[in-house]
Swiss-Prot record:
Stated name of the protein: Aspartate 1-decarboxylase
Major location (coarse): cytoplasm
Gene3D superfamilies noted in UniProt: 2.40.40.20
Database matches in SUPFAM superfamilies: ADC-like (SSF50692)
Source organism (scientific name): Pseudarthrobacter chlorophenolicus (strain ATCC 700700 / DSM 12829 / CIP 107037 / JCM 12360 / KCTC 9906 / NCIMB 13794 / A6) (Arthrobacter chlorophenolicus)
Chain's gene name: panD
Length: 141
């Protein structure tokens, strides 16, 4: 049996632009894609911290070092410039693979520059962010 497991995320990224009249997708700085092990064209879930919207789309590689997080097409009705978002990927794994897998977590600053890489999906490093109550860290599992 395969399980759908958390694979990677880019945490608390800032939307740099939202363009309604563009072919749908999300444009992401190639440095961020590589750090999170996300390929161009890969399915991502995007959660908007600012307004609670959620959607799925695919990635387009953006200029390396640009910090771009561009919401394209119809998704621009839901997510806007300067919104904080989380881009999340999932993968199908066997139970054995899932138990051994270490996800990629990319924390970014307000300019979408990488400030920390990790593998604990519950770790909060941004000011004011705390670990969810009762959440174990990966080392405790």
């Amino acid at each position: 049996m395969n399980r759908t497991m958390f694979k990677s995320k880019i945490h608390r990224a800032t939307v740099t632009h939202a363009d309604l009249h563009y072919v749908g997708s999300v444009t992401v700085d190639l440095d961020l894609l590589e750090a999170a092990d996300i390929l161009p064209g890969e399915l991502v879930s995007i959660v908007d911290i600012t307004n609670g919207a959620r959607l799925e789309t695919y990635t387009i590689a953006g200029e390396r070092g640009s910090g771009v997080i561009g919401i394209n097409g119809a998704a621009a009705h839901l997510m806007h410039e300067n919104d904080l978002v989380i881009l999340i990927t999932y993968a199908q794994m066997t139970t054995e693979e899932a138990k051994a897998y270490e996800p990629k977590v990319v924390h970014v600053d307000q300019d979408n520059r990488i400030i920390q890489l990790g593998n604990d999906p519950a770790e909060g490093i941004a000011p004011g962010m705390t670990r969810p109550p009762f959440a174990l860290n990966n080392a405790a599992l």
